[in-house]
Amino acid sequence: MSLSNPFLLRLNELYQSFIKFDATQCDRVNRYRNIEPESALFLAMQVRIQQSKKILEIGTSTGYSTLWLADAAQVTGAKVTTLEIDEKRTLQAKHYAQELQVDNVIDFWVGDAQNFLEQSQEKYDFILLDAERNAYLNYWTYLQHMIEPKGGVLVVDNVISHAAEVKSLINEIKQDTRFMTTTLPI
């Protein structure tokens, strides 16, 4: 659909419904915790700008960011691999992807992301890390070898809103001279 009005309207409807759901959940783990629309748009723009071909998303939830990535992937000829530990949320994400006709560029993987990362030999030119923050540093052990050396990008969500929880990951990346890092207030 490439960011057509019907696509954007449906994304907005989904986002609003996810926000309402989250407001009813006392336990943080039960919330969908999708990224903000501005962040999602930034991700889609980044994929288009760098003409990404292999995209990895760690933390599908209900697929809000996945939909944005998949729309951009259709434009660039990319494939999105998205990881989610919760099968029910993956089924929701698949439903929305089919509804919005972007499912043809998405591979859904259900299970612990750590297992996927340990086994994967793939290189990705765009990686979105938006999962349980206490696992980020462990994931970095594998992600640093999965980022395409020529122009690959890793986007880490919650760097500002949960700075203390991701500080060790950010410090680890900053110490590695193979990578550059910056924080964007989106």
Where in the sequence are the language-model features?
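A short alpha-helical cap/connector motif
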Residues: 1-126, 133-155, 159-186
